[in-house]
Amino acid sequence: MTAPSMSRPDDVRPEVLDFKPYVPGLSIDEIRDRFGLADVVKLASNENPLGTSPVVQRTLKTKADLAFRYAQSGNPRLTRAIAAHHGVAPERVVAGNGSDEIIDLLIRVRATPGKHNIVAFRPCFSIYELQAKFCGLEFRQADLRPDFTFDWDAFLAATDENTAIAFVTTPDNPSGWCPPVSELEHVARTLPPSCLFVIDEAYMDFCGDEAAHSLLSRLDAFPNIAVLRTFSKSFGLAGLRLGYGILPERLADYLHRVRLPFSVNILAEEAGLAALEDTVFRSETLRVTAEGRAYIAEGLTALGCEVMPSWANFIMFRPPTDATDLFEALLRRGIIIRPLKSYGLPQHLRVSVGNADENRRFIEACKEILPHA
């Protein structure tokens, strides 16, 4: 008897057949091997310029013998610490294996295939679209304005009574744009009542003035808002995969019910607790990022690049020459940044803010490659 083929289209859900997976930035090892380089700088994935907090490193060493244990269900110590950090009720907080897990759970909990749609801007963080389509949902997008600010009229026009979730990232990725909080208030009040407004604030720590840009402190006035945050950026825990949502309490309860057990492992939880306590490291991260962002913006502008204003830990820019040529020339010099073709921006690039030496190497390499202004 012949074994059934696993390549038949009817063996998987239709949504999977043409599914395009998330494409991460190139790794240091890939570029070392490709070009035979000993020293490679990665400025592609918006990671912490200072690495990992020394307090977190000591905690991981001290707690390593707990690796055989399961974390406590729901990570109550961590959710209480996050709640205290933001001044919200612990019942609002759901921790996840990166904020990606919270995005996935929100879509699967709130949206019904064949009925609901999901709305976001174009371009946007690709996970919104990937998970919406994987769940068999219609995914709608509103274009940004030519200057990459948010066209809220187009965004609201894309929604209707069947919109389960409207996603916005602020500061935005890849542009770095961060709208004033008054605009978010207007949208929250104007969206259809049944629509959940999910504000992804992965980069909010870097904006400089959260009160002017975030609704997190005003959630009681907006029952249709969920806010996402991450430990990957200012806390320096990208490799441990730890994020969280601050949600309406009833919705948070549903997510706790359906999430996979122990998705936040015990060492990630201990690292998150330590990171919240290390305010010195976080403050230094924000200082280094602000200084580096200004240095990179000034350097690129002097080289004739069109530099987008940024409130995040990265800068999007358009070079005066072909973006792919610059990207590849930087790779040959051992510097990895992010091409934005996958975002529909083939002539733009995104560079993460690194430490002072990494930023200097990037600008010096650009000076060698780009025609002098």
Curated annotation (Swiss-Prot):
Its cofactor is pyridoxal 5'-phosphate. Keywords: Amino-acid biosynthesis, Aminotransferase, Histidine biosynthesis, Pyridoxal phosphate, Transferase. The modification N6-(pyridoxal phosphate)lysine is found at residue 233. InterPro entries: Aminotrans_II_pyridoxalP_BS, Aminotransferase_I/II_large, HisP_aminotrans, HistidinolP_aminotransfase, PyrdxlP-dep_Trfase, PyrdxlP-dep_Trfase_major, PyrdxlP-dep_Trfase_small. Pathway: Amino-acid biosynthesis; L-histidine biosynthesis; L-histidine from 5-phospho-alpha-D-ribose 1-diphosphate: step 7/9. One of its GO terms (biological process) is L-histidine biosynthetic process. GO terms for molecular function: histidinol-phosphate transaminase activity; pyridoxal phosphate binding. It catalyses: L-histidinol phosphate + 2-oxoglutarate = 3-(imidazol-4-yl)-2-oxopropyl phosphate + L-glutamate. It is an enzyme of class 2 (transferase). It comes from the Bacteria. Its EC number is 2.6.1.9. Belongs to the class-II pyridoxal-phosphate-dependent aminotransferase family. Histidinol-phosphate aminotransferase subfamily. Homodimer. This is Histidinol-phosphate aminotransferase. It comes from Nitratidesulfovibrio vulgaris (strain ATCC 29579 / DSM 644 / CCUG 34227 / NCIMB 8303 / VKM B-1760 / Hildenborough). The gene is hisC.
